């Protein structure tokens, strides 16, 4: 069957009429930029953790399993990822391969800015023998840092694994709604939906379990002659 259910995304802003009366050239661009940023932020939240009831199904949620309130259940958080080594990433790569049915290339790691500084970078980068720091991962990992990722959790996903459709964003100004406050209300809205192609396209893990990378050093003792 074809599911054509759509969800409405709404953004709004209240603007004092006095600002409009000034007719400064940058005012319209400034308000448009703020509303555009709000739309983008809403789309990111929906992609990450949309509840599937009043929003798209986020990659942190299960597609076909719901709670009693009608929202899609959160995925189980993996707590065994401690290193970005072949062994450390094996459980994640096995899941992303969908039980061996697809090849996994570049991994995309989504994390909160605080967790990037405290956990991700110390585990991902290490001192090189020649000085400086290097990426210690054995395969490509691309970081995507966003404040919408919940602190303490991170997600590893793959490309071309999420489908989202969105209508154009329409903006309308209401000049009487807040008349007593001498203000205009601008409301923008769009319709859309989205979901991952399957539950195995993204893995949520406890980022606080990551261990700092330590350069392995082997001490060799030369036997006395």
PLM regions: where:
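Extended oligomerization regions of viral-like shell subunits
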Residues: 53, 57-190, 214-225
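Beta-strand elements of well-folded, non-transmembrane domains
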Residues: 41, 190-194
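Tubular lipid-binding modules of the TULIP superfamily
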Residues: 199-201
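Short helix/loop capping segments that flank catalytic or ligand/cofactor-binding pockets
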Residues: 22-24, 118-120, 195-197
